[in-house]
């Protein structure tokens, strides 16, 4: 545990899903005011404090036999093994990589089109560790706290392959831009390979589906239908409302939306 990490996690859990906890903090949490701290803890998020700034991190763990739509996560190691045993040349081939190097990544931002003025407020990713699929999310509680937000993210990124849904054009360039602005404060940006499942989905299903948005592909192809989901286009409005009122209730729904996104990237890759 790095020196600047403060950690307090609630006891919440679900039958087939475990909210992961971290060790006790090294620095007193009382040094930083965290609005609605109890609600964050109950949701399974803990603060990470760095020089009087902080971000919030949530981690959830799923067993490999967990079924997400039509598929279970234990199929991922099988697929990676097949790629490694195959000589087939394909843009999505995982040949040369291990399953625990796959990094299924998505963000939520303050704007849907990218460009100037758009900032990431949630970094979410799923990965294989200790025979579980883990989802880790880093949340930016306010503009100006980007250093702990990106620092903790980059400190935990040890994966060589980035898997996204249109992330090559949108999500990762946003990270690169922010890193450029803060690079003297942040770890070196890792080198990633990049598997973008959006382009493969367009080639496969653009003539069969009305749209190839991830939520549509989930429902029509992967057999996963979201319940009580918050549409992604509402994320900027919800985040700005959170900045104003600090109540995280609606943010929790955005984080669940993001969690489903990264889990669906796994089953889509399968």
Spans of model-derived segments:
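Acidic, Mg2+-coordinating catalytic module of metal-dependent nucleases/exonucleases
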Residues: 209, 214-270
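N-terminal accessory regions of nucleic-acid-interacting proteins
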Residues: 1-98
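Short, conserved acidic/polar surface loops in the N-terminal third of protein domains
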Residues: 68-69, 113-118, 175
């Amino acid at each position: 545990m790095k020196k600047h990490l403060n950690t307090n996690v609630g006891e919440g859990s679900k039958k087939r899903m475990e909210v992961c906890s971290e060790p006790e903090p090294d620095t007193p949490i009382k040094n930083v005011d965290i609005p609605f701290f109890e609600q964050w803890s109950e949701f399974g998020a803990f603060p990470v404090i760095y020089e009087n700034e902080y971000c919030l991190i949530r981690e959830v763990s799923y067993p490999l036999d967990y079924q997400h739509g039509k598929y279970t996560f234990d199929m991922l190691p099988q697929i990676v093994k097949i790629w490694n045993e195959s000589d087939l040349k394909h843009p999505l081939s995982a040949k040369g990589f291990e399953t625990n190097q796959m990094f299924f990544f998505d963000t939520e931002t303050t704007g849907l089109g990218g460009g100037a003025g758009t900032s990431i407020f949630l970094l979410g990713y799923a990965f294989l560790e200790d025979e579980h699929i883990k989802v880790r999310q880093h949340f930016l509680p306010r503009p100006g706290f980007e250093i702990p937000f990106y620092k903790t993210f980059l400190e935990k990124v040890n994966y060589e392959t980035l898997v996204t849904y249109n992330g090559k054009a949108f999500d990762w360039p946003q990270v690169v831009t922010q890193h450029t602005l803060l690079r003297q404060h942040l770890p070196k940006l890792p080198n990633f390979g990049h598997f973008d499942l959006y382009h493969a989905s367009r080639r496969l299903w653009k003539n069969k589906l009305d749209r190839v948005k991830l939520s549509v592909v989930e429902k029509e192809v992967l057999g996963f239908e979201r319940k009580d989901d918050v549409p992604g286009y509402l994320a900027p409005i919800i985040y700005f409302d959170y900045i104003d009122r600090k109540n995280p209730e609606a943010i929790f729904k955005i984080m669940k939306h993001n969690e489903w996104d990264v889990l669906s990237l796994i089953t889509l890759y399968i």
